[in-house]
Swiss-Prot record:
The gene is ALD3. Keywords: Cytoplasm, NAD, Oxidoreductase, Pantothenate biosynthesis. Belongs to the aldehyde dehydrogenase family. The lineage of its organism: Eukaryota, Fungi, Dikarya, Ascomycota, Saccharomycotina. One of its GO terms (biological process) is beta-alanine biosynthetic process. It comes from the Eukaryota. The active site is at residues 268, 302. Cytoplasmic aldehyde dehydrogenase involved in ethanol oxidation. Involved in pantothenic acid production through the conversion of 3-aminopropanal to beta-alanine, an intermediate in pantothenic acid (vitamin B5) and coenzyme A (CoA) biosynthesis. One of its GO terms (cellular component) is cytoplasm. This is Aldehyde dehydrogenase [NAD(P)+] 2. GO terms for molecular function: 3-aminopropanal dehydrogenase (NAD+) activity; aldehyde dehydrogenase (NAD+) activity. Pfam families: Aldedh (PF00171).
């Protein structure tokens, strides 16, 4: 018999747990149909943690049938008030288990427990509380007067069966943002975690069952993207798919939808987000925000301000202080245990990602001969895992691959601009449009930037501060659609128009 559970000990926090390893279908953990497994590795040590069941096409079909039966027979007939009760039950369980869930994120994704993983759980709790309280208060249609004898009304109805594919940089936070919006709207869900980071979502599935959600409403099927992701994208009985990940894979998901049943689609893809620092900004605060916006989560954030443009009159001063802040507050050396409060910058997710980021650093240093600053020598002495020191490249030209490509690590490029028009041109010169930030005390200038920048999110005098009530999504090649807030529910609803004729035959 395949192993469906294992015991995990986290001695640093005195946490012991029974970790599910199976596919979660119809509220039960089960083996994959072919018995294949995936080994998951602790990125802080490079050592294996455990192995979990890997779904295949047959398992996807099994999950779809479970989700379809649950939608047709139970969930579509469940009132919004009752859905809110289930989400409220889930909220209580998340609050009770938040340290365990955060610890699994630290173990499996390398997130520093105290400064990062616990913050993720706080955001998940906020999101769950929002949807639990709002689920029966959304506008689900409107009446439209037409003539004396005719009117129409609209109904917002769920799609039905929704597939969701979540990334490895925010495994549980992204899953909850997608899952809870879809559930609040009345859909059933099949969710695929990233193969690097499946443990927290599998454990979360136990809370789904405890919260009272009927069997088949939420199904968790870990596996490889090339197998499970492809099967979800092409399945003819899935009504909608939501994906977060790279732009390249997002394009494949879009193509799969077009080649199958034209399922509705939401994509949240890559970014190369700019942060603009004007000469009238509070320089110290701007530097603190910009450092946090690229080095937090080891730069593995789709909205990371990986391009920083500074007005030429304060450029040298900014660069000097930015390097000082990076060294003082974000240094990695000797802080290799993400469960230790001293660890602020964790490892990147895998050896593959480590090598990829390293190649960009080497290119910038040797091939492009850019000015470079790192908080520690690299490779870092004593590090067993995939640790990369915060890296700052300065005076970077627009032609540089480091400025054009999404590196997805603690690597930032800094360049200068002369005036507003110059800054805006530089900021918009990218195929991406996920997020942006501007630092200035000039209210008019700040709102002009918000108007003119081609990005789905704009932060003024801060960066990377997402809120549960606020829609999130990208422009251009950064995505299609929005999640979070009321819009995050509308995203999982479709509109039906009803025409009513009141005229009487004579």
């Amino acid at each position: 018999m395949p192993t469906l559970y294992t015991d995990i000990e986290i001695p640093q926090l005195k946490i012991s747990l029974k970790q599910p390893l199976g596919l979660f279908i119809n509220n039960e953990f089960c083996p994959s149909s072919d018995g294949k497994t995936i080994e998951t590795v602790n990125p802080a040590t490079g050592e294996p943690i455990t192995s979990f069941q890997a779904a295949n096409e047959k398992d996807v079909d099994k999950a779809v049938k479970a989700a379809r039966a649950a939608f047709d027979n139970v969930w579509s007939k469940t009132s919004s008030e009752q859905r809110g009760i289930y989400l409220s039950n889930l909220l209580k369980l998340i609050e009770e288990e938040q340290d365990t869930l955060a610890a699994l994120e630290t173990l499996d994704a390398g997130k520093p427990f105290h400064s990062n993983a616990k913050q993720d759980l706080a955001q998940i709790i906020e999101l769950t509380r929002y949807y639990a309280g709002a689920v029966d208060k959304f506008n689900m249609g409107e009446t439209i007067p037409l003539t004396f004898n005719k009117f129409a009304y609209t109904l917002k109805v769920p799609f039905g069966v929704v597939a969701q594919i979540v990334p490895w940089n925010y495994p549980l936070a992204m899953a909850c943002r997608k899952m809870q919006g879809a559930l609040a709207a009345g859909n059933t869900v099949i969710i695929k975690p990233a193969e690097n980071t499946s443990l927290s979502l599998l454990y979360f599935a136990t809370l789904i069952k405890k919260a009272g959600f009927p069997p088949g409403v939420v199904n968790v099927i870990p596996g490889y993207g090339s197998v499970v992701g492809k099967a979800l994208g092409t399945h003819m009985d899935i009504d909608k798919i939501s994906f977060t990940g790279s732009t390249k894979v997002g394009g494949s998901v879009l193509e799969a939808s077009g080649q199958s049943n034209l399922k509705d689609i939401t994509l949240e893809c890559g970014g190369k987000s700019p942060a603009l620092v004007f000469e009238d900004a509070d320089l110290d605060k701007a530097i603190e925000w910009v450092a946090n916006g690229i080095f937090f989560n080891s730069g593995q954030i789709c909205t990371a301000n990986s391009r920083v443009y500074v007005q030429s009159s304060i450029y040298d001063k900014f660069v000097e202080k930015f390097k000082e802040t990076a060294k003082k507050e974000w240094d990695v050396a000797g802080k290799f245990d993400p469960f230790d409060e001293k660890c602020i910058v964790g490892p990147v997710i895998s050896s593959t990602q480590y090598d990829r980021i390293k190649s960009y650093i080497e290119r910038g240093k040797k091939e492009e001969k850019l000015d470079m600053f790192q908080t520690s020598e690299f490779p870092i002495g004593g590090a067993k895992g995939y640790f990369i020191p915060p890296t700052i490249f300065t005076d970077v030209p627009e032609t540089s691959k480091l400025l054009r490509d999404e590196i997805f690590g603690p690597v930032v490029v800094v360049s200068k601009f002369t005036n507003y028009d110059d800054a805006l041109k530089l900021a918009n010169d990218t195929c991406y449009g996920l997020a942006s930030a501007v630092f200035t005390k000039d209210v008019k200038k700040a709102h002009m930037f918000a108007r003119d920048i081609k990005a789905g999110t704009v932060w003024i005098n801060q960066t990377n501060q997402e809120e549960a009530k606020v829609p999130f999504g990208g422009f251009k090649m950064s995505g299609i659609g929005r999640e979070s807030g009321d819009t995050g529910v509308d995203n999982y609803l479709q509109i039906k128009s009803v025409h009513v004729d009141l005229s009487l035959d004579k």
